[in-house]
Amino acid sequence: MAKPEPDVVIPEGDSSKGAKLFKSKCAQCHTINKGGSVKQGPNLYGFYGRKSGASDYAYSDANKNSGIVWSDKHLFVYLVNPKQYIPGTKMVFAGLKKEQDRADLIAYLKEASSK
């Protein structure tokens, strides 16, 4: 069963700022290019609209069973504190507290994961 989307309002994001955030906060563990390698975390290419835990990566049961279909709203809340949003996730990232940083990163992820 799909997890309902959170009821949040997301500011407009800037993908160029999001690219910088991805490089500094995410690229140590993730790639986002088509055919990119799996690092400590999964390649994020094409993850928008996909069920959490659905790609070629050894996801935790928590991710596989979360019922999340990745969208802007799910990401916006998830990125505040991944371990709180999906208890039991392998994601070790502490999160992004600033709304604008999350909006910028989401704009970049959405753009880069579909190129």
Swiss-Prot record:
Keywords, sorted A to Z: Electron transport, Heme, Iron, Metal-binding, Mitochondrion, Respiratory chain, Transport
Subcellular location field: Mitochondrion intermembrane space
PTM note: Binds 1 heme c group covalently per subunit.
Positions contributing to heme c binding: C26, C29, H30, M91
Annotated GO CC locations: mitochondrial intermembrane space
SUPFAM superfamilies: Cytochrome c
Entry keyword Electron transport: yes
The keyword Heme is assigned to this record: yes
Single GO MF annotation: electron transfer activity
Stored PANTHER family: CYTOCHROME C (PTHR11961)
Function: Electron carrier protein. The oxidized form of the cytochrome c heme group can accept an electron from the heme group of the cytochrome c1 subunit of cytochrome reductase. Cytochrome c then transfers this electron to the cytochrome oxidase complex, the final protein carrier in the mitochondrial electron-transport chain.
Family under the similarity heading: Belongs to the cytochrome c family.
Name assigned to this protein: Cytochrome c
